[in-house]
Amino acid sequence: MDPNCSCATGVSCTCADSCKCKECKCTSCKKSCCSCCPVGCAKCAQGCVCKGASEKCNCCA
């Protein structure tokens, strides 16, 4: 379980707007699930890998 999310890691779920989970594929999270992913990225919920804090993730490049 992600301490910042009320669901199992890697499982589609609904999270609050304050969701900070990175591994959880939050379907309702309005923020990017990756710090390097732009807000609103449609592919971020499919899971992405961030190479660095300032780099784009591989699914939103």
Swiss-Prot record:
Binding site for a divalent metal cation 3: 15, 19, 24, 29
Residues given in the record as a divalent metal cation 5 binding sites: 34, 36-37, 50
GO cellular component: cytoplasm; nucleus
UniProt binding sites for a divalent metal cation 4: 33-34, 44, 48
Positions of a divalent metal cation 6 binding: 37, 41, 44, 60
Biological process according to GO: cellular response to cadmium ion; cellular response to copper ion; cellular response to zinc ion; detoxification of copper ion; intracellular zinc ion homeostasis; negative regulation of growth
Entry keywords, A to Z: Acetylation, Metal-binding, Metal-thiolate cluster
Recorded GO MF terms: zinc ion binding
UniProt keyword Acetylation present: yes
Signal peptide annotation: none
Residue numbers bearing the N-acetylmethionine modification: 1
Stated role: Metallothioneins have a high content of cysteine residues that bind various heavy metals; these proteins are transcriptionally regulated by both heavy metals and glucocorticoids.
Protein name as it appears in the record: Metallothionein-1
